[in-house]
Amino acid sequence: MSNAVSIRKCEISDVEILVKMRLEFLKEAGYVKDTTNVQELIQELEEYIRSHVNKDLFFWVAEIDTVAVSTGVLMFWDKLPICAGKQNGSKVGYVSNMYTIPKFRRKGIASNIVKEIIKYGKNLGMLKIMLHASEDGKGVYKNLGFTTNESFMEIKL
């Protein structure tokens, strides 16, 4: 077994991998506590990913010997124009679902996925990329140049 990590942008054929990694993320975060509705969740995830992959959601996977060890997602939206010129209709990105299997953490894998996401966002002409960081992930993002923005407010509906 080699330790070489390869990172690639996912295609629709990767749905099974993406669903598996999303389930691991949800279990670890405490959202999936039992197996009662797991099959239904798997079906919903498959449908959602198939309808959004490489349209408004872009997924990356890091693999070692073709085994997925980390994933990340970039979603985006077009920002409403605020003035004439450069920012008119520019895209804003949001990184979500960064997940690395525990035994592969602290090896720079997630950082490398985020670097690929940033590069892709730049190529799409994004104004900025945002995210909500876990405590464990804050260092990763700060080291890559992300800054804290405390201007967000939200209401849960």
Model features per residue range: what roles?
Residues V114, G121-A133:
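Conserved GNAT acetyl-CoA-binding A-motif
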Residues I129-G139, E154-L157:
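Conserved beta-strand-loop-alpha-helix junction that forms the acyl-donor binding cleft
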Residues V61, V67-F76, Y94, Y99:
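Conserved beta-strand in the GNAT
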Residues S6-K20:
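A short beta-loop-alpha structural element at the N-terminal edge
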Residues E47-V61:
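A short helix-loop-beta-strand connector motif used in the catalytic cores of GNAT acetyltransferases and
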Residues F104-E116:
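Conserved acetyl-CoA pyrophosphate-binding loop and the N-cap/start of the following alpha-helix
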Residues L26-Y48:
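Conserved GNAT-fold acetyl-CoA-binding loop/helix
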Residues Y141, F146:
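Conserved active-site tyrosine of GNAT-family acetyltransferases
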